[in-house]
């Protein structure tokens, strides 16, 4: 259970990071 929660947290973090990576170049 804890491992799955950690994986989900990492996934959400990766998703937000990818969104920022897509938004930053366009905004800049």
UniProtKB/Swiss-Prot annotation:
Activity regulation (UniProt): Activated by divalent metal ions. Inhibited by certain thiol reagents.
Sequence intervals crossing the membrane: none
Annotated protein name in UniProt: Arylalkyl acylamidase
Annotated disulfide bonds: none
Lineage: Bacteria, Pseudomonadati, Pseudomonadota, Gammaproteobacteria, Pseudomonadales
Role this protein plays: Shows a strict specificity for N-acetyl arylalkylamines but not acetanilide derivatives.
Reactions catalysed according to its record: an N-acetylarylalkylamine + H2O = an aralkylamine + acetate
A GO molecular-function annotation: arylalkyl acylamidase activity
UniProt EC number: 3.5.1.76
Quaternary organization: Homotetramer.
EC class (word): hydrolase
Species annotation: Pseudomonas putida
Keyword terms, alphabetized: Hydrolase
Top-level division of the source organism's lineage: Bacteria
